[in-house]
Regions:
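Conserved beta-strand and immediately adjacent loop positions that scaffold enzyme active sites
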Residues: 79, 87, 174
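Unchanged
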Residues: 103-194
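Acidic, metal-coordinating catalytic segment for phosphate/diphosphate chemistry
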Residues: 35-79
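Short hydrophobic/aromatic beta-strand or adjacent loop that forms the aromatic wall/cage
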Residues: 1, 77, 149-153
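Extended, hydrophobic interaction surfaces within ordered domains
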Residues: 5-53
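Active-site beta-strand termini and strand-to-loop segments that position acidic
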Residues: 82-85, 156-158
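Nudix hydrolase/Nudix homology domain
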Residues: 2-4, 15-28, 96, 167-208
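Conserved Nudix-box catalytic region and its N-terminal flanking loop in Nudix hydrolases
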Residues: 21, 27-28, 83-119, 124
């Protein structure tokens, strides 16, 4: 199942996995009409203020991938959930509970970007990747351009003493350990994409 998040609404392609959307596939004649229709639909969906979940079925991954590339500028990112003693590291970015993440630089792998961004945003070093988590996809308007951000997520551990230092120039004001007593407030306050996609993983991490 492939989901795109925008503010408080979700677009769902239940029969498609995100890895099927890679460019380079051959476009069939039947896909051409779907691509045009999907581009129109995506534009209307972005303008719609109704906070609902919308399902799109019986469309080929090729058509979906091409429509997304025509509608959005792709902006890959990576981040991580740092685990320590049954808790995880959360941040407050511009007043919103969040997880450390950032853009993938040219020539950088998602894994390297996750390690770099988490250390930059939290001040926590000696990070190691334990496993990959599901990616999140969300879109936003930057200037006059719609961007679609895929964020690669990883569970991270560290041998470093947890002496966090928030990256204030990125709007981060707090870096905290989140445990059982704080997780409900974190998930309620964070972005819909994190709550829906990573929420179950977070609850496993802190053993709820």
């Amino acid at each position: 199942m492939y989901k795109i998040f925008h503010e408080n609404k979700t677009l769902v392609f239940p029969n498609i996995e995100s890895e099927e959307l890679k460019s380079g596939a051959t476009i069939q004649e039947s896909d051409t009409y779907d691509i045009e229709d999907l581009c129109i639909f995506l534009s209307e969906w972005l303008d719609d203020t109704d906070p609902t979940q919308t399902l799109i079925q019986q469309v080929s991954p090729v058509a979906v991938g091409e429509a997304l590339r025509k509608t959005f500028r792709l902006a890959p990112a990576a981040g991580g959930i740092v685990v320590s003693g049954g808790k995880f590291v959360g941040i407050t970015r511009k007043g919103i509970p969040d997880l450390p993440k950032g853009h993938i630089e040219a020539g950088e792998t998602p894994e390297a970007a996750a390690l770099r961004e988490v250390e930059e945003e939290t001040g926590i070093g000696k990070l190691k990747i334990e496993r990959e988590l599901p990616s999140t996809w969300h879109c936003y308007l930057r200037g006059e351009t719609w961007e679609l951000k895929r964020t690669y997520w990883y569970v991270l551990t560290t041998d470093d003493p947890l002496l966090p230092h928030p990256q204030q120039e990125e709007g981060i004001t707090e870096v905290n350990l989140v445990g059982k007593d704080e997780v409900e407030a974190f998930l309620e306050g964070t972005f819909l994409s994190i709550r829906e996609v990573l929420g179950p993983e977070i609850l496993k991490i802190i053993k709820i």
